[in-house]
């Protein structure tokens, strides 16, 4: 781990910005925003009332990071690691983001998917300290006063969930708060968005999870989920309260709402507020980026693909709609593009006239039934003969060996995306995909899988189609540009910006996404491209327009190095403060 540490350390008072504070003594150590642990300098200890409250040694952030990594190595349980890492955030915010940024590839699966799903399911059992804002259905009429209780005055990014569809785990109620918290950690770690500008929110309207309603450690309302007009009124009141306090251009990201509400709220609020839904639009952008990367490998334009989805919920529909936009950009009409996309859900293939209900959002991808109607997903593959299958059902190993072999027999280079989270819900493993297609497939997954070595010695590095490639960079650009509304074209631009960062060498390794180790650079580059797009298309409202967009973005990213807490000390000219000599 020493190789990951920043070997050049400079005295904090010289290298760091000065942070003006009013607190002194113990409160500085109890506030994670100002606490440095053993890294307070001697001058800070003496002038800020800390001398004697800490052991005499003065540490660098490097040593603190090294201590963290050595302690982490002693732990074996992912949940134990999660509790330890998030405990660092509660005590020392700068150190938390320093260690996360230094080893993002290894630590992201702990602070976010897949471990965050386990942490959410155990939220009441591992609870240490509340994070974020909790608003319940019982608070109707008083939401603004609750928002006013949040101590930060300059929030620019809100991630909100109602806990109904947490990853592939279903309705977790307020236990879902771990998702907004984890998401905003990645806003900061990947894109440098200031943590004090971020607000995680959980809307509690009850839960239909019977196990939680019987759990003595559950922390939400002990009632069935409210699905009446009162629920809609609460969301309306929340949106108004946030923007009344923090401004109309405050970014509000909807996260893990149920399918019906996710689409409904996106359509309802997108022209009124600065909002997006990561499950719909973020997932769509990262999936499209993977397809655009596959296009580079097989030299087959996206407009010539036939795509079959396993799942027809918000993720599938979001991906499908963005693929349609890309196909239209490549010369097809909207109707021609929609006809190239099929969906298979738990009731079977989406076809006209089927008994199972079809949502209005699914209608563009509901086609006339083929001559032989498939009973299983494998049948659908053999009948429709798709070039690409995309799994977003969250139902486990439904890309069976027979499905994968069928794709390999139909296509020279089959595209197989198993995007469901967490790992246990993935449609197949990377090893299954590469082995059963003899290394010919182009594979991406929603959860991390390690490199796969085939019997002939070839090694493939599967790409992880994680939304983290998209949402931090998009959020940074939107915030810096004072954007008022976020169109789907922004996510199309982000997908293209992501694909453009892949090297030929990485494509040859089987990667459809850049290495996660490069996520900070990737996110900043996406933010730059999206910023350029927003200004070029009159969607940016921060003036004057910066001439150098790259410089503008890079100069406004938050850093994890410690700030100096000392007041500015400087000299005045002696003559300016000396009284004149009075002569009689």
Swiss-Prot record:
Q: Where is the active site?
A: 112 (proton donor), 183 (proton acceptor)
Give the residues the record marks as binding fumarate: 67, 91
How is activity regulated here? Subject to allosteric activation by fumarate.
Is the keyword Nucleus in the record? Answer: no
**Any idea which UniProt keywords this protein has?**
Acetylation, Allosteric enzyme, Metal-binding, Mitochondrion, NAD, Oxidoreductase, Transit peptide
CDD domains annotated for this entry? NAD_bind_1_malic_enz
Positions contributing to a divalent metal cation binding: 255-256, 279
Q: This protein's superkingdom?
A: Eukaryota
Q: Where in the cell is it found?
A: Mitochondrion matrix
Give first and last residue of the transit peptide: 1-18
The reaction(s) catalysed by this protein are: (S)-malate + NAD(+) = pyruvate + CO2 + NADH; oxaloacetate + H(+) = pyruvate + CO2
Biological processes annotated in GO: malate metabolic process; pyruvate metabolic process; regulation of NADP metabolic process
Q: What is its EC number?
A: 1.1.1.38
Is Magnesium set as a keyword in this record?
Answer: no
Subunit structure as annotated in this protein's UniProt entry? Homotetramer.
Q: Per its record, how is this protein called by name?
A: NAD-dependent malic enzyme, mitochondrial
Q: Which organism is it from?
A: Homo sapiens
**Underlying gene:** ME2
């Amino acid at each position: 781990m020493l190789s990951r540490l920043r070997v050049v350390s400079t005295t904090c008072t010289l290298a760091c910005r000065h942070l003006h504070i009013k607190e002194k003594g113990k409160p500085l150590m109890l506030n994670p925003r100002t606490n440095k642990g053993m890294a307070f300098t001697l001058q800070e200890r003496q002038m800020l009332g800390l001398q004697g409250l800490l052991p005499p040694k003065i540490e660098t952030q490097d040593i603190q990071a090294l201590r963290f990594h050595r302690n982490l190595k002693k732990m074996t349980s992912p949940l134990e690691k999660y509790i330890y890492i998030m405990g660092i955030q509660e005590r020392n915010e700068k150190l938390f983001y320093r260690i996360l940024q230094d080893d993002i590839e290894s630590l992201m699966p702990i602070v976010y998917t897949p471990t965050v799903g386990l942490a959410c399911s155990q939220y009441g059992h591992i609870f240490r300290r509340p994070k974020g804002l909790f608003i319940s259905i019982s608070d109707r009429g008083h939401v603004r006063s609750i928002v006013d209780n949040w101590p930060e005055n300059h929030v620019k990014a809100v991630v909100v969930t109602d806990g109904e569809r947490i990853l592939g785990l279903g309705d977790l109620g307020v236990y879902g708060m771990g998702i907004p918290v984890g998401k905003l950690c990645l806003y900061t770690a990947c894109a440098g968005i200031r943590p004090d500008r971020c607000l995680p929110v959980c809307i509690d309207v009850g839960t239909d999870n019977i196990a939680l309603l019987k759990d003595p450690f559950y922390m939400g309302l002990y009632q069935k989920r409210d699905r009446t007009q009162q629920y809609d009124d609460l969301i309306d009141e929340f949106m108004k309260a946030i923007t009344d306090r923090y401004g109309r251009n405050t970014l509000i990201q909807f996260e893990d709402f149920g399918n019906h509400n996710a689409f409904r709220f996106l359509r309802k609020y997108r022209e009124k507020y600065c909002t997006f839904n990561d499950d719909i639009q973020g997932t769509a952008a990262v999936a499209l980026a993977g397809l655009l990367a596959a296009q580079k490998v097989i030299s087959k334009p996206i407009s010539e693909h036939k795509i079959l989805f396993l799942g027809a919920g918000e993720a599938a529909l979001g991906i499908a709609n963005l693929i349609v936009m890309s196909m239209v950009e490549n010369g097809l009409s909207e109707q021609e593009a929609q006809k190239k996309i099929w969906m298979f859900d738990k009731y079977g293939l989406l076809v006209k006239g089927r008994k199972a209900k079809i949502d209005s959002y699914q209608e563009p991808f509901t086609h006339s039934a083929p001559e032989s109607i498939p009973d299983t997903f494998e049948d659908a593959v053999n009948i429709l003969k798709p070039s690409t299958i995309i799994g977003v059902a969250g139902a486990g190993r439904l890309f069976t060996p027979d499905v994968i072999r069928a794709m390999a027999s139909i296509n020279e280079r089959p595209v197989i995306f198993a995007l469901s989270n967490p790992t246990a819900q993935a449609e197949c493993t990377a090893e299954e995909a590469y082995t059963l297609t003899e290394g010919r497939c182009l594979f991406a997954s929603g959860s991390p899988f390690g490199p796969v070595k085939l019997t002939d010695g070839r090694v493939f590095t599967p790409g992880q189609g994680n939304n983290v490639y998209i949402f931090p960079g998009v959020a940074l650009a939107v915030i810096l540009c004072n954007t008022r509304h976020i169109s789907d074209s922004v996510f199309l631009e982000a997908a293209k910006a992501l694909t453009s960062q892949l090297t030929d060498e990485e494509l040859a390794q089987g990667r459809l996404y850049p290495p996660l180790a490069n996520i900070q650079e990737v996110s900043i580059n996406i933010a730059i491209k999206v910023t350029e797009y927003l200004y070029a298309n009159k969607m940016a409202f921060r003036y004057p327009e910066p001439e150098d967009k790259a410089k503008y973005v890079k100069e406004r990213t938050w850093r994890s190095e410690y700030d100096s807490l000392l007041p500015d000390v400087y000299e005045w000219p002696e003559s300016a403060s000396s009284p004149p000599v009075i002569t009689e």
